[in-house]
Amino acid sequence: MSFSPRGPSRPVLRRRRRGAALPTVVILVAVVIAVVVGARITADVWWFDQLGFLPTFTTKLWLQVLLFTLGALLLAAAVAVSLTLGYRARPIYAPVSDEQAGLDRYRESLEPLRRLVVVVLSAAAGLFGGSVAMSRWETLLLWWNRVDFGTRDEQFRMDQGFYVFTLPWLAFLVSFLTAAVVLAGIAGLAAHYLYGGLRLSGAGPRTTRAARVHLASLAAAFLLLRAAGYWLDRYELMTTSSGYVRGVVGPTYTDVHAVLPSKAILALIAVVVALLFVAAAVGTSWRLPAIGTGLLVVSAIAIGGIYPWAVQRFQVTPNRQSLESEYVGKNIDATRDAYDLSDVEVSTYAADTTASQGQLSEDAQTIPSVRLLDPSVVSQAFQQTQGQRGYYKFGETLDVDRYATPDGGTQDAVVAARELNLAGLADNQRTWVNEHTIYTHGYGVVVAQGNDRAPDGSPSYVEANVPTSGDLDLEQPRIYFGEGTTTYSIVGGRDNEIDYPDGSAGGFATTEYDGSGGVAVGSLLQKLVYGLKFGDQNILLSGSVTPESRILYDRTPRERVEKVAPWLTMDGDAYPSIVDGRVVWILDGYTTSNSYPYSAATELGDATTDALTQTQGSSVQALQDRTVNYVRNSVKATVDAYTGKVDLYAWDDTDPVLKAWMKAFPGAVEPLSAIDGSLMQHLRYPQDMFKVQREVLTRYHVTDPASFLTGQDFWDVPGDPTVDAAAGTVRPSQPPYYLTLRMPEQDTPTYSLTTTYVPASNANASGTQVLRGFAAVDSDAGSTKGTKSEGYGTIRLLELPQSTTVNGPVQIQNNIRSDTAVADQVRLLSVGDNSRVIYGNLLTLPVGGGLLYVEPIYAQSTGDNSFPRLSRVVAVFGDNIAIANTLDEALDEVFGGNSGAGAGDEGAPPPTAGTPAPTDGATGGPAPDPATGDAQVQLQQALDNAKRAIQDSSAALAEGDFTKYGEAQQRLRAAVDAASAAEARLERSGTSGPTSSSSPSASSAPPVPGETPAATPTP
């Protein structure tokens, strides 16, 4: 038989080609991955180096690499060694049986792939082990740099630092080694069974000597690790809740007298059984270790489960108060210490509910500081009056800060940064050149007085406009780093960045970035690295990237601080301030632990979620869902809005957790003494810290163990009364509010963060929302370089006695809405269904010996350019409710014609929803023309007529005179029609504020030198 010479060569060639193709593809994929990963790491090195935090990055990186390597090697080796031993220790002559005959087929099928299977399984175990170990870099670093707390627990006499730093690392080591032994045991069992070293049936010994030594050794190692786990469980009882006393963390009576001894006994039994397995490894029988294992299981059930249950059921439950009080007291003390609540100043406040003339005379300094501007409502007013162009935007929720007044005092202010908004560009402007090299930054901070308004109900600004102007000496208004800057920008090298709109021929002033922020991107290598990092070829190809260019990325303040300090938990609200003529973002950082002995655990996400965090588009975020039982506001951070420079300051330098991190990253955190006075005066007590503390205080304001066990005096944070909740749903919590007020124990008003409390639902079956507590924390950090004010951080808690009945916020809001006078005014503000009424934040103030509620009411017409205007103010004291154009008038009405304290807004005219918005960005806007003035007069007259008609209607109904009632209703309809017509004329003739359509058109955008015009640039 003859064969064609080409016949056999073709399949061989195909096999060789297929065989060579697979490694080539694998190598190419590996090279691509390596290049991309290398580019990202290189970019990170440049980014951290530019900020001066390169040691932080390298320490974390190399520690993660080390842990990944060790973890991967350990688990991979455990699996590989067990599989290899199982194969090499296979018997030469396996007994003949049906079981072995069936396994022979599997052995034959597996043999060609045996080594590959070992490699794949070992690699999978290694990847799992490496990823788990790598994630514990913080645990290792804290243990390595641990410090003492200086106090010891009463149970084991161990320093608190042992539980916070050492115990988590030891527990991880034991659990990780246990996982390695378990995987090795599973692999060993499978290998020995497959290759005949372990049999389930047949005559004679069921294991070979080699299999017995291997498996018994692994069992002994597992039991020794289990013994270590039992021993550590004793200490972990200090940081967990056994459930014997609901919600109480730390050992209770049953834990101390039953669980702790049982853990020690089980640890001893596990060691004994481990020795029995060692004996089995050198002996010939599994009998003793099998008996020992059974004894361990029975002991775990009887000693570890049944005995503690019996002690709890028959000894503790009948005597709960006497036996558990000692341990509940330890939990109360430790929890208050862990959340920095040990020094809360508590006083009983028998609030007066009767209003009388002059009652607020002692609070004459507080009343003028009442903040009427609601930061969660007035964003649209800022946008319409100060937005200027569509590519500028303010946050949905604005911030509260303080600024000096000409008389040397301070005033609460609502602040917002005018940030870049690329979504506001027209479609034909959304090009790569425009978005990354032309529109690069926001401009200016807008500051409005918190306790005042303009004549038309819009905010009264003290710093505003473009170019910026005002009383606060803002010298560098450009915002290259802000909460809205989520894309990268390439700046420098060309004077073509749009700075702000002006009256020039092009319509815009331009600028060139000359700050130190960002990373150089002018060289070919730098372009390649960042092109790979962002997956954008334009960085490499565009002529807009010059040798002098710098790339700005990771630009939001929160992500910048989180990158340079990954060990911090960041507050959900960064706020802008003007410090030394520059815009600076201020953030708060927390050090936390979930291992503080005896302290109750808190879910950060739940505790910090409120009505603001659930508002769509809000810049205020809740903290991540994580359980902690220790928290400190240990760091204040700042981010320069122009350079992106990050500074970390040790705010609580007594915090042991911060001390450990400062040892781990020396030089990363500056001392408190480095904080300049100009920055200090803008630092405040953080919202999220207070939210967590107020959540803890709902239960831990009760310091008597017996009362704590009953739970009858627990509180809740009330729901936000301004949020409409559907039937059967729960309102989100009312957020805490920054207010300048004087607590009853204080001599002068202080900038504070406040909250209220109502009875817990399970402690108040009737569901009445009466007030039970009011808390305020001193938030004024002072203005002295490197020194916090003496009272900063002091929490003052007013507890209302059970005999005092003061309505809570939700009930007060219901009373306001059902009040006849308020309803009449709301109807006036909603004339012709062309307006909507918005209830602002309901503020609570402990003044006049009682509790005063103040709520601003905003009106907004339905026009495209309208915004909420502060139109009325409601004041409530006891059962007295008043609504007026000003707070001054409302207070006087509540307190019998004279409150005794002036609010300072007595001259404010009654604004309406239809007043047009100013166009020039200033508070007052241009003078209205005569037609507009006539319309305003006609609108006010119509509103007055409507008010009188409503009053006449009510009087006629009360008298039963339906003829007069019908006449009054006709006059009301006529007044409504007249008001609607006047409002329509105002909308047509009024000068409306800028909208997104005001953004630069294709023809008005400045061209890029050397490129096509900015309207249609191509990279």
From Swiss-Prot:
Topology versus the membrane: Multi-pass membrane protein
Subcellular locations according to the entry: Cell membrane
Gene Ontology cellular component annotations, sorted alphabetically: extracellular region; plasma membrane
Pfam family, one: UPF0182
Predominant location: membrane
Ranges of Pro residues composition bias in the record: 1006-1019
Biased composition, class Low complexity, residue ranges: 977-1005
Keywords carried by this UniProt record: Cell membrane, Membrane, Transmembrane, Transmembrane helix
Top-level taxon in the UniProt lineage: Bacteria
Presence of keyword Thylakoid: no
TM annotation in the entry: 19-39, 61-81, 115-135, 169-189, 213-233, 264-284, 291-311
Chain positions covered by the region annotation Disordered: 897-934, 977-1019
InterPro entries named in the record: UPF0182
HAMAP family per UniProt: UPF0182
Protein family: Belongs to the UPF0182 family.
Protein name in the entry: UPF0182 protein Krad_1193
